[in-house]
């Protein structure tokens, strides 16, 4: 009986631990759309990770950000009215530098790097990003993405496991809204993506479920399955289910605002 009670107590303790909420405002975030809030958000993520996991909560407001670095056992929740806005790089600050990859020559630059993104994680597990908020990649670009400090993707994940993206809206996402490479057990549910380059790039991934998503990407792939050599090893993409999704090629932003326009006269590689 004592052993059962001890196990029950440990279970409750673990549930309580992982239910801990870390409000980014308590870590110095201003949510005024001007202050760069990624350092405060990263402090909240680090505190949650140090405690074994928890929910990093972003209340309503505008969070100008450079790179947000994910950790294992973290749930990032964007409240209604929350906007994570990718800031334009400055002279002295910007996005994390793209990590070296000796296999660059086998696929383009965008598929070969993950850290030069608004939100990124490498070698992690048990990650959720959810909520009715918006990720707005305003300062992300495909052009000049090789330069230090430049960010070119909204969310990048490499060699991660047990990832859920749910209920988010994403606008103007640079080269990719999501680059998932070598991810096992990935769930993408009820996302609305309105961009003009790639929506979801599912690369060398296994056990993927994509459902109830709207992806507008007039100049590139909406949802694409592939197997590049970005990981430096051969790995198939397998066991993928895509259901109840809507993909389109309307002007960027016009699906989000409900106007559904087809007037944009720009070439695919310009206007970022």
Model-inferred region functions:
Residues 8, 17-272:
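Extracellular/periplasmic carbohydrate-active domains that bind, remodel
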Residues 4-13:
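Sec-dependent N-terminal signal peptides
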């Amino acid at each position: 009986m004592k052993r059962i009670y001890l196990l029950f107590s440990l279970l409750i303790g673990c549930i309580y631990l992982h239910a801990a909420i870390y409000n980014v405002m308590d870590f110095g975030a201003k949510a005024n759309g001007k202050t760069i809030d990624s350092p405060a958000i990263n402090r909240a993520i680090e505190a949650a990770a140090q405690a074994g996991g928890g929910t990093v909560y972003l209340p309503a407001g505008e969070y100008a950000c450079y790179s947000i670095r994910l950790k294992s056992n973290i749930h990032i929740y964007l409240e209604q009215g929350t906007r994570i806005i990718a800031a334009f790089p400055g002279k002295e600050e910007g996005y994390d530098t793209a990590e070296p990859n000796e296999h660059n020559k086998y696929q383009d630059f965008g598929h070969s790097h993950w850290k030069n993104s608004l939100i990124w994680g490498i070698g992690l597990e048990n990650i959720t990003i959810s909520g009715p908020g918006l990720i707005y990649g305003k300062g992300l670009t495909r052009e000049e993405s090789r330069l230090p400090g430049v960010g070119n993707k909204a969310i990048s994940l490499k060699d991660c496991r047990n990832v859920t993206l749910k209920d988010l809206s994403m606008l103007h996402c640079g080269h990719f809204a999501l680059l998932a490479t070598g991810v096992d057990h990935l769930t993408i549910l009820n996302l609305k993506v309105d961009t003009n380059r790639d929506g979801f790039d599912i690369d060398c991934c296994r056990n993927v479920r994509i459902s109830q998503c709207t992806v507008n990407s007039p100049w590139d792939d909406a949802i694409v399955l592939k197997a590049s050599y970005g990981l430096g090893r051969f790995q198939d993409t397998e066991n993928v289910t895509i259901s109840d999704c809507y993909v389109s090629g309307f002007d960027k932003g016009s699906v989000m605002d409900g106007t559904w326009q087809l007037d944009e006269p720009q070439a695919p590689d310009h206007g970022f």
